[in-house]
């Protein structure tokens, strides 16, 4: 018969595995098999089935009622506390009952009131938020992992408020303990209860997701980073523009602000107005059927669809890329114009428009997008006016 074992270690880490055994298999031998799978010594394990601990190692599994497809819980026993030979200051052992001894106090021993507990004798780690906070602040690597895996606790840690950090830590510990109790209750429930089985399935799925994410963080941390988008320098109607290269876009587009800056709004054919649909929707003002785009030393004919609200100035779509047989060479970080053989380098992040950078300036994320667009449009118009003044005789 196939028995599924849900194992909970002392550190609350979990593992699930299955064992194929006979019904007359003794519990002692079953513990040994579990030790091989889980790494937990057989003497430290407690096996629970149907909310009942299995204690007699000489009995067979079938005598406990186990059958094919059942689930048992294997828990690692708590480690016995080791105490130094010298007595701890501030701890009173006189009230501890010793098995086989009288529980009455020894009249020859003076009864002293217990002093207040000494904070130095508290368990270290999670039971001492102040110490844990100091350890995390002193370890940049652990702090970075905490920011990735537990943002609420990291935020409380960096706030500098010990009381807030303690509160968040205790809330998370209580929530984890509650989930652990719920998980144990589900695994001990009736195996024919559909609701319980559905919750167990969801719990296993979430566990697999967390395990997959942990492996990805260890083996491929670069997958959690962001890449810089592909931009090139070009000129439209003689005006410099930073163009976004997007082979997934069907058509080449330009923002209304960029079209005004390049003085091609007079060429917009409004009969081509409509709605552009992609991740979102935007209004198309019209189309410029032919304009000149300069990339390095090449002058290429191009058409644009003008969008009313577009954060980027210009986007080179697949129509433009296929027309001029362009190829994206990521190894050399260049865009190759196939019809001419010209190479142009993709821009580094520092030269990208602000809307395309991975990190905006301080406080920029708090500014509404409409206000950012208004500022950029005002800057463009002002720059255009300054250039016009400079060209006057």
From Swiss-Prot:
InterPro entries: DDI1_N, Peptidase_aspartic_DDI1-type, Peptidase_aspartic_dom_sf, Ubiquitin-like_dom, Ubiquitin-like_domsf. Its EC number is 3.4.23.-. Signal peptide: none annotated. Residues 1-81 form the Ubiquitin-like domain. Keywords: Aspartyl protease, Chromosome, Cytoplasm, Hydrolase, Protease. Residues 82-127 are annotated as: Disordered. GO terms for molecular function: aspartic-type endopeptidase activity; identical protein binding. A motif (Ubiquitin-binding) lies at residues 370-389. PROSITE patterns: UBIQUITIN_2 (PS50053). The keyword Hydrolase applies. It is an enzyme of class 3 (hydrolase). The active site is at 246. It comes from the Eukaryota. GO terms for biological process: cellular response to hydroxyurea; proteasomal protein catabolic process; protein processing; regulation of DNA stability; regulation of protein stability. Residues 107-118 have a biased composition (Pro residues). It is found in: Cytoplasm, Cytosol; Chromosome. GO terms for cellular component: chromosome; cytosol. Coiled coil: none annotated. Belongs to the DDI1 family. PANTHER family: DNA DAMAGE INDUCIBLE 1 HOMOLOG 2, SODIUM-GLUCOSE COTRANSPORTER REGULATORY PROTEIN -RELATED. Homodimer. Aspartic protease that mediates the cleavage of NFE2L1/NRF1 at 'Leu-104', thereby promoting release of NFE2L1/NRF1 from the endoplasmic reticulum membrane. Ubiquitination of NFE2L1/NRF1 is a prerequisite for cleavage, suggesting that DDI2 specifically recognizes and binds ubiquitinated NFE2L1/NRF1. Seems to act as a proteasomal shuttle which links the proteasome and replication fork proteins like RTF2. Required for cellular survival following replication stress. This is Protein DDI1 homolog 2.
């Amino acid at each position: 018969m196939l028995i599924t074992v849900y194992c909970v270690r002392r550190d609350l880490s979990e593992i699930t595995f299955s064992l194929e055994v006979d019904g007359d298999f003794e519990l002692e031998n079953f513990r040994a098999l579990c030790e091989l799978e889980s790494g937990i010594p057989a003497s430290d394990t407690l096996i629970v089935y149907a909310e009942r601990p299995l204690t007699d190692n000489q009995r067979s599994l079938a005598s406990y009622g186990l059958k094919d497809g059942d689930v048992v819980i294997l828990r690692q026993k708590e480690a016995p506390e080791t105490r130094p030979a010298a007595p701890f200051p501030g701890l009173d052992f006189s009230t501890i009952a010793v098995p086989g001894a009288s529980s009455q106090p020894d009249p020859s021993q003076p009864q002293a009131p217990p002093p207040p507990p000494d904070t130095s004798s508290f368990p270290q780690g999670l039971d001492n938020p102040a110490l844990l906070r100091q350890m995390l602040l002193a370890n940049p690597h652990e702090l970075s992992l905490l920011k990735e895996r537990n943002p609420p606790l990291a935020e409380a840690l960096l706030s500098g408020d010990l009381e807030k950090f303690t509160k968040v830590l205790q809330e998370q510990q209580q929530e984890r303990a509650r989930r652990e109790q719920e998980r144990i209750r589900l695994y001990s429930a009736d195996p024919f209860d559909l609701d319980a089985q559905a919750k167990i399935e969801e719990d296993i799925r979430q566990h697999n997701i967390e395990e997959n994410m942990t492996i990805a963080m260890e083996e491929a941390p670069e997958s959690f980073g962001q890449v810089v988008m592909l931009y090139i320098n070009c000129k439209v109607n003689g005006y410099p523009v930073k163009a976004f290269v997007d082979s997934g876009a069907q058509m080449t587009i330009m923002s209304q602000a960029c079209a005004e800056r390049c003085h091609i709004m007079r060429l917009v054919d409004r009969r081509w107005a409509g709605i552009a649909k992609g991740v979102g929707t935007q209004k198309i003002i019209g189309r410029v059927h032919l304009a000149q785009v300069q990339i390095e030393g090449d002058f290429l004919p191009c058409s644009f669809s003008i969008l009313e609200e577009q954060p980027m100035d210009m986007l080179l779509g697949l129509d433009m890329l296929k027309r001029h047989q362009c190829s994206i060479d990521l190894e050399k970080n260049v865009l190759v114009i196939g019809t001419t053989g010209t190479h142009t380098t993709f821009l580094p992040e520092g030269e990208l428009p602000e809307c395309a950078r991975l990190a905006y300036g301080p406080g920029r994320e708090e500014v509404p997008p409409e206000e950012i667009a208004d500022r950029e449009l005002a800057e463009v118009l002002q720059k255009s006016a300054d250039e016009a003044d400079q060209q006057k005789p």
